[in-house]
Amino acid sequence: MDSTFELKKNNYQPNSLTLSRQEWGVNERKILGLLINQLDFNRDYDPEKSHIFKLPIQEVAKYVDYKYMKASLDNLQSCKIQVFNKEKDTFSSLVLFPEYHYNRDNSGKIEMIVTNSSLVFLLNLGKEYTKYNLDIFLQFQSVFSQRMYEIVMMELKNNHRKSFEYELDFLQQIFDTKYNNFANFKLRVLDKARNDFFEKADLILNYEPAKKKGKKVISIKFMIQTATDVKFEAVEEEMNDFRKADPNQVVLVAKDIMLREYKFSREQEFMILNSPDLLTTFVEINSRIDNGLIKIRSSKTHYLAKSLGFGKK
């Protein structure tokens, strides 16, 4: 392994790449992600020259099986991307990697030659760009999950929007997919991405038709939540129920929880159940623990006793 090769936590790429039409598969895009990770935005690249990026073959093989590597590199070399400018109604076609070399001179590396124009394109982030976690990206085994992840991270970063809308035709175009109706697109693209996001990215992706022409879906509205958002909402819902509930019923429920899940002394139980402030704190912290917002390293009883101020002089 090349000791000088290091993966950075996040990738940065222009939004025009995120929203470009690409014909690459999941393995090609993993290699692309590894290459983008090696871009140095503080370096003064010569804009008149091509540049060679070197990826250790052993590093690439962690994410792309050796038997698929040549075909993936061939596709990266041969397939174009189309970059759209909707405002000006124009588009450009680019070949990012016109040349590559595999293990030249037994180097143990893949050498990707990036043209000067392609390098300028990749480095031109502007004020708005896409930032995503490389490790999460490399876990996806679906190209559609990869593409949706980039779009979601672009929207979250640039617009801080957890709700946004895209035309179905546009998504079908940039994803280069043949799923030409909403039902198939939802099943093959969106549902897969939603499952992958939940398992690998701590994101909850929801979607629904936004606009229709007759029965045909024209655009899709996306709603994004993190798993942490959902946990906070669960705590808030439980606290709202607590505030509305009959006080006597609350005491009975809290006492039952203490007996089943905690080992307070009788004096501590009495203090909690007979103090509205302590009882409210107990219910909220218990909810945060149960919903995963608080990770307990010792014991729930010890943590809550400390939070309630027991043992202080």
Language model: regions and residue ranges:
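Charged, low-complexity interaction regions
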Residues: 267-270, 293-295
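Charged, alpha-helix-forming regions
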Residues: 1-260, 283-313
